[in-house]
Amino acid sequence: MIEAVALARELLRIPSVSRDERAICDFIEERLQGDGELSLARFENNLVARIPGSGPRVLLAGHLDTVPGEDRVFEDGEVLGGLGAVDMKAGVAAMCEVATRDLARDLTLVWYSCEEIDASENGLRRLAGAMPGLLNVDLAVVLEPSGGAVELGCQGTLRAKVELRGRRAHSARPWMGRNAISRAASLVDRVDRLEPRRPILGGVEFKESLSAVRIESFVANNVIPDSARIWCNYRFAPDLSPEEAAARLLDWLQPVLEEGDTVTVEDAVAGAPATMSGFEGLVAAAGSVRAKLGWTDAGFLATHGVPAVNFGPGDPLLAHSPGEVVAKAEIAGCVEALASWLAS
């Protein structure tokens, strides 16, 4: 049987930045091939394992890739550290141990590529297209780091570009023009003053946020700019559709918009509903439950009618940071909680 903590240590030594997951996928496939209970299928750098069983059909999903960063791996007492320790090689290792346990449920496990980059390359989406029936399951758990709590649903996310107009002039005579950067400052202030909605959904509280994440404006060092572009990211609760979120954003920005300004929604995806139905045993085993702040592939699964939660080892606040560390006890605890639920 695979032991998750030892496997996580090995996985941390295998670089797997997005689009470079072949080595880690090969490694996991080789480790699982000796288990006679598993039926394995490979598509590109994505791996699917199936275990027949009874009761509701469950899917566990975890991505193999990491963001770019330093490959230093370290171990300090009761923690493992390194790029991807939290996001999400600890969760990937936990899945591997669960796959070798004696379980009662009908189980599908998916290790997939390219989660950290553009959605068009996401391995889970590519698998769903290449393997009809893969998502014919009743429940799903995405093993994103959750600090050992079950996180229900996920937020939707919307990115909008706001273009503000000004009037160009020489910087020695700024009163002859209208500075689009000054207008942008007013818009950013408006963005920062949004009162976030905090709806209670499925018994947990979601907190929305709106942030300015990028700004551009330049003509020349001696020119008052006549345009400025600001990109905003709105993380909205899953009770709103992307269309409703876009309408709310536009309504909030309206007081600082003028004729000739434009707001373009460049990307918007729905969140996943917060539901505990079917996951009560997992919540009991984990010991705590809360809302998922952020978007995960639970949202993608929800669009296919699959209720999904997030549950994995590691503090999500450490993801993508140079200080990624995960407690060995948290990895083992994740395995035991999943195994307890799936054995029932």
Over which residues does each language-model region extend?
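Acidic-glycine-rich active-site phosphate/pyrophosphate-binding loop
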Residues: 64-76, 137, 152-163, 309
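Metal-dependent amide/peptide-bond hydrolase catalytic core
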Residues: 145-146, 152-153, 159-344
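Acidic/His- and Gly-rich active-site-bordering loop/insert found
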Residues: 1-85
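Acidic/histidine-rich catalytic neighborhood of metal-dependent amide-processing enzymes
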Residues: 93-159, 202
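Active-site metal-coordination/substrate-binding segment of hydrolases
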Residues: 57-111, 119, 123
